[in-house]
From Swiss-Prot:
Example of a GO cellular component annotation carried by this entry: plasma membrane
Gene: pmrR
InterPro entries: PmrR (IPR049795)
Name used for this protein in its record: Putative membrane protein PmrR
Organism field: Escherichia coli (strain K12)
Principal location listed in the UniProt entry: membrane
């Protein structure tokens, strides 16, 4: 159960990082 929550949190965190990186890249382009 705890491993499942950690896995989902890691997925959400990576998605946020990628989306913010793409947003900054498009904004500065």
């Amino acid at each position: 159960m705890k491993n499942r929550v950690y896995e989902s949190l890691t997925t959400v965190f990576s998605v946020l990082v990628v989306s913010s990186f793409l947003y900054i890249w498009f904004a500065t382009y």
